Regions:
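Non-catalytic C-terminal interaction segments of nucleic acid-processing enzymes
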Residues: 1, 35, 98, 104-169
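Acidic-basic catalytic patches of nuclease active cores, encompassing PD-(D/E)XK
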Residues: 1-43, 47
Length: 169
């Protein structure tokens, strides 16, 4: 990732704290899915799964996580929220505060609850989809950073509008 992406994420973390940073990251992830031609069927900031999306008649369930250190905590509830729900059950983790922050998309059926380093989750990732979404992530942060800086509500309002426009296409 470009240094500017890391810098912008750091600004959002410092301004909003861990809880809202997680929600903002989840909305950014939703924007990435839309840019990659996914149709968002479910998007919720609380509850599980966080996102259900469809592309090419294939359904995906995502639990979106952020981390504040070297490991990410994956709860049993996170896994149960996506497992068995769809064809593709994914734990999506933003690797911030790593300098080369990126999305890691781990197959939920391949892992168990616990604290895991990003390197472990990478071993269970869907790398082709991961590459697609990470390519979009830089653009999404640049496009929506100012709105995200205002807060979760402002960014979510824009996200809802984009979702409505996509449904009407």
């Amino acid at each position: 990732m470009k240094p500017r992406v890391y810098s912008n994420l750091k600004k959002l973390w410092e301004k909003h704290g861990a809880h809202d940073f997680g929600r903002i990251s989840q909305i950014f992830f939703g924007f990435c899915l839309i840019e990659r031609q996914f149709q968002i069927k479910i998007f919720q900031l609380t509850g599980r799964p966080d996102i259900v999306a469809v592309r090419n008649n294939k359904k995906f369930a995502f639990e979106v996580k952020t981390q504040s250190g070297s490991d990410v905590a994956i709860k049993n509830e996170d896994l149960l929220g996506v497992k068995g729900y769809t064809e593709q059950a994914i734990i999506a983790v933003l690797s911030y505060p790593d300098l080369d922050c990126m999305w890691v998309l781990a197959k939920a059926n391949d892992i168990r609850a616990g604290k895991w380093p990003i390197a472990f989750l990478k071993q269970h990732s869907i790398s082709s989809l991961e590459d697609e979404l990470n390519e979009s992530f830089q653009k999404i942060i640049e496009k929506y950073f100012t709105t995200a800086y205002l807060g979760t509500t402002s960014l979510y309002d824009v996200f809802e509008e984009v979702c409505k426009l996509e449904k009407n296409k």
